[in-house]
């Protein structure tokens, strides 16, 4: 007996079965997948950062 895992589409909230029958998972459709990609590209979404990265401008891979 196998249980289906159901997740909500991050874009529209529709139920999506997590499995081979849902090729765009966790999204319900290609449309929702592209909407999400567009939001990341437009910087409407971002991963929060706890630190101040202002000192990273002087960073270099070269050894002193």
Swiss-Prot record:
Keywords: Metal-binding, Zinc. Its cofactor is Zn(2+). Zn(2+) binds at residues 9, 12, 28, 32. GO terms for biological process: regulation of DNA-templated transcription. Residues 45-64 are annotated as: Disordered. Disulfide bonds: none annotated. InterPro entries: DNA_gyrase_inhibitor_YacG, Znf_NHR/GATA. Pfam families: YacG. Coiled coil: none annotated. Binds 1 zinc ion. The keyword Cytoplasm does not apply. Residues 54-64 have a biased composition (Acidic residues). GO terms for molecular function: DNA topoisomerase type II (double strand cut, ATP-hydrolyzing) inhibitor activity; zinc ion binding. Inhibits all the catalytic activities of DNA gyrase by preventing its interaction with DNA. Acts by binding directly to the C-terminal domain of GyrB, which probably disrupts DNA binding by the gyrase. Interacts with GyrB. Belongs to the DNA gyrase inhibitor YacG family. This is DNA gyrase inhibitor YacG. The gene is yacG.
